[in-house]
Regions:
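Conserved alpha/beta core of the MobA/IspD/sugar-nucleotide pyrophosphorylase nucleotidyltransferase superfamily
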Residues: 161-233
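Residue-level signal for inorganic ion chemistry
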Residues: 7, 33, 90, 105-106, ...
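Residues at the starts of beta-strands that form the adenosine-phosphate
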Residues: 47-49, 128-129, 203
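Hydrophobic packing residues within well-ordered alpha-helices of enzyme cores
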Residues: 16, 61-65, 120, 173, ...
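Conserved beta-loop-beta/alpha segment of the NTase-like Rossmann-fold superfamily
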Residues: 75, 81-143, 163
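Short, flexible, basic/aromatic active-site loop/helix in glycosyltransferases
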Residues: 142-164, 168
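Conserved N-terminal catalytic core of the sugar/cofactor nucleotidyltransferase
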Residues: 34-99, 183-184
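N-terminal glycine-rich phosphate-binding loop and ensuing alpha1 helix
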Residues: 1-59
Length: 233
């Protein structure tokens, strides 16, 4: 059984308000993308890597791969308009390897740890799909569609905040999307959500993440990431 790390780096990062896509922003002397890829590349349990990027940045990423000597990177693939489009590009690239374990990771989570990747790989021995997550610490409320008023308060003890990587056997995530595309009302939020909805018989295991494994979403997050990068683990 081989394990493939899929680094999703095709987003525009518009919410940062910066002209440079967030995965190419500098962080501790490297780009955000380099931090994410390097951790996966260094992990002994990762056999291959695929990086999915916007087509306009393929040459740039191929140059980064060469500069870093990342010999586990087998392909730099063009991403799609939506996140699930980018996931599918990688899924279809391994169509001939249905039992391959695929770990999908947001490039914008540069502080993913070796421990998280190890635990995700181990969890895939028990489950056909997993998600990295951490317990919710704030009370979560449900509101009306306009966000005007509360409609209910959720039981915090049952709620977890999703992170990445998310892991699947290739055949499972491919089947989930095949079923989803039969639904004219299909709208994808993430890969695990697609499995939960369209393959209800598949249990999605939980792997405990880390508060350090934050996603770069807004420009202010860069300062926090710089601090966490320099702070003792």
């Amino acid at each position: 059984m081989s394990t493939v790390g899929v680094i999703l780096a095709a987003g525009s990062g518009s919410r940062t308000g910066l002209s440079t896509p967030k995965q190419f922003l500098p962080l501790g002397g490297k780009t955000v993308l380099e931090h994410s890829v390097q951790t996966f590349h260094n992990h002994p349990g990762i056999d291959e890597l695929v990086i999915v990027v916007h087509k306009d940045y393929i040459d740039q990423v191929q140059s980064i791969v060469k500069q870093n000597g990342w010999n586990k990177v087998k392909a730099v693939l063009p991403g799609g308009k939506e996140r699930f489009d980018s996931s599918l590009v990688a899924v279809r690239a391994y169509a001939d390897h249905p039992d391959t374990v695929m770990l999908f990771h947001d490039a914008a989570r540069p502080l993913v740890s070796e421990r998280i990747i190890t635990d995700a790989i181990k969890a895939m021995e028990r489950f056909d799909a997993i998600d990295v997550a951490i317990p919710a610490v704030d009370t979560i409320v449900q509101c009306d569609k306009d966000g005007t008023y509360m409609t209910s308060i959720q039981d915090r003890s049952l709620l977890w905040r999703m992170q990445t990587p998310q892991g699947f056997r290739q055949r499972v995530i491919e089947q989930a999307y095949n079923e989803a595309f039969k639904d004219p009302r299909f709208t994808a939020t993430d890969d695990c959500g697609t499995v939960l909805r369209y393959l209800p018989g598949v249990k999605v295991g939980i792997v405990r993440g880390s508060e350090r494994n934050i996603k770069l979403t807004y420009a202010a997050d860069l300062s926090l990431l710089e601090f966490l990068l320099s702070a003792p683990k």
